[in-house]
Amino acid sequence: MELWKRSIKELKELIEKKEVKPSEVIESFAQRTKDVEVKIKSYVTDLTEQAVERAKQLDEKISDLSEIPELFGIPIAIKDNISTEGIRTTCSSKILENYVPPFDATVIKRLKDKEYVITGKTNLDEFAMGSSTENSAFFVTRNPWDLDRVPGGSSGGSAAAVSAGLAPAALGSDTGGSIRQPAAFCGVIGLKPTYGRVSRYGLVAFASSLDQIGTFTRTVEDTAILLNIISGKDPKDSTSADREVPDFTKFLDKDIKGIKIGIPEEFFVEGLDSQIKELVMESAKLLEKEGAELVSISMPTTKYAIEAYYIIAPSEASSNLARYDGVRYGFRASDYSDLEEMYSKTRDEGFGAEVKRRIMLGTYSLSSGYYDAYYLKAQKVRTLIYQDFMKAFESVDIILTPTTPDVAFRIGEKVDDPLQMYLSDIFTVSVNMAGVPGMSIPCGFKDGLPVGMQLIGKPFDEGTIIQVADRFTKLKDFSKDFPQL
């Protein structure tokens, strides 16, 4: 089997046994990138040449090591809203097109400590605002399973890269579904950890109370390996949780007898494609055969999640994005007569339509006279959504839902209808609102396009999600299914 088809775990073992060199691993992925990247366009900054050079250095280093670091020579792609020292970090926005950060995000530092190799910075919806990666200021990334369709968003580039075999894993960020929805559309595994599990230091902020960095992989085992590395308290992020990080690989290869799985009626409603509903319920029944118990539950407030999310997230964005004014870094308009005109022209020329829409929505929601009617009310709904989850978790260990209401849609299909676009996150946003962990895993295909199933866990209980997902993928394994490109 070609090296680019192998998982982190498999590559790690081959390198440790000295059966392959890091350079051979990276060259295999570099060749794959050369062959297919032109079709899918997942990278804003393609770093495969530098990756090959870095791997050659690791070849020489390996003989001097008594212990080989966990990600030694393993290629990983990084979403382009995560700071990488000395490497352009654009957020797929014109306003940051030439911005090169002077520091690494904490997650990048943790990967570097394990000697990973960065393959590139992946495309996204501008400032992570979108569900299709069509809002990138540079180009549209395509779904490897059907090049006329979107890969999902906002982390579409990361999902497409892992799906097409350009890297065995990638990092993304998830504010309302931006890891899980593209993972479902591209047929890979996407995990959004509990809010606070992974440091956000160095993640360019969209909505600070909702954003969380997570992973894309092809196997649950690889998810566990990466989560072990990137999790944990960080003094540079006051919202990172001071909680002990368990060894997530200990949750692999366990049975699921007696685990109670909640099936919420609000997630199996009109608007959900009938074939997806069937596939997800078949998958739930498979888990039941393995000894899990299926429990019908109700989470009535979750149906208001989208409305509340599109007040809270834009409100936080309008505040966070105020810093892009052309003064210290990033794009600056060239033709202006005074400071005020420089600000407004820079922001007008630098931001795309969706980002402007959300800044305006957020500013409106926070303005005097509307704050109580919109923002405050949305925060109250958020509390009720959290309480819905906590009540459900009194009787179940994990919740199972579809990840998306339908498979990947065609490029251009929803561009002129933002509300339709927003609804593709209908099953994912409530997880961010409650701050709980969620994972999308492939559970089948509809008309040749991947379908995702979502597993939602208690706060800081990614372990049970990994346990159930691992058991499921041993029954239905899609990790070696690659799209024909």
Curated annotation (Swiss-Prot):
Q: What's its job?
A: Allows the formation of correctly charged Gln-tRNA(Gln) through the transamidation of misacylated Glu-tRNA(Gln) in organisms which lack glutaminyl-tRNA synthetase. The reaction takes place in the presence of glutamine and ATP through an activated gamma-phospho-Glu-tRNA(Gln).
What SUPFAM superfamilies has UniProt attached to this entry? Amidase signature (AS) enzymes (SSF75304)
- Tell me which GO cellular component terms the UniProt record holds: glutamyl-tRNA(Gln) amidotransferase complex
Q: Which keywords annotate this record? A: ATP-binding, Ligase, Nucleotide-binding, Protein biosynthesis
Q: Does the keyword Ligase apply?
A: yes
Catalytic reaction list: L-glutamyl-tRNA(Gln) + L-glutamine + ATP + H2O = L-glutaminyl-tRNA(Gln) + L-glutamate + ADP + phosphate + H(+)
Q: Tell me the active site.
A: K79, S154, S178
> What InterPro entries is this protein classified in?
Amidase, Amidase_CS, Amidase_dom, AS_sf, GatA
Question: How does this protein assemble?
Answer: Heterotrimer of A, B and C subunits.
Q: Which family does the similarity line name?
A: Belongs to the amidase family. GatA subfamily.
Pfam families assigned: Amidase
What NCBIfam families is this protein classified in?
gatA (TIGR00132)
- Positions of transmembrane segments: none
Q: Fetch the Gene3D superfamilies from UniProt.
A: Amidase signature (AS) domain
Q: Which domain of life is it from?
A: Bacteria
| Enzyme Commission number, as recorded | 6.3.5.7
Protein name as it appears in the record: Glutamyl-tRNA(Gln) amidotransferase subunit A
GO biological process terms held by the UniProt record = translation
The molecular function terms in GO held by this entry are: ATP binding; glutaminyl-tRNA synthase (glutamine-hydrolyzing) activity
Q: Which gene encodes it?
A: gatA
Question: Could you confirm whether the keyword Acetylation appears in this record?
Answer: no
